[in-house]
């Protein structure tokens, strides 16, 4: 497949899948800018999209140059478009990008274990051990997820956006062991580890299972610790859905 001569902006989610999509498109020298957005903002038309944009793992918006996705729901919502590269059988948007541009032959510098890790992460196919004591790529996945909540506890040297931008380049030619030892990743790992056991106890003590539903009530907690969003399911393996209740801003409402 011929490589486009011009450069595009990548519009994607601020998560591990978005990070790897950025790596792949940067490896093909297709992008010179990255914008991280929320999917609902795309659906609500709040993000201006045109022919200079490539989107990944987001709802399709008309006018985009290329849109990569793997959600089956998008095949129902949107009529088939030539620039909508969607594969519901793929476990991640990064895998769709990877396959579209030629797979391993097109990306000799991208380690296969990285693609397996992003597939596992986006499809939530973690083992209990990987959830409760993550290592390697799984650990990077969780610390880069805003839902883990690390940003509530420390003003890091650089923002998550800056770290994502640095990792798009750094991850292309460094091992996961080297990535986890970089200062800006390491300080997030240290905070994650410092909260790990407290978060498990909190999830266990504040949760009540009703059938297959897990109710997590955090309104009596002075501190809500940081931790990955799958821990509660590892602690309560019979639950298949959870409802989390906590105070809103200045306890004016519950959310």
Give the residues covered by each predicted segment.
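Hydrophobic, aromatic-enriched interface-forming segments
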Residues: 121-213
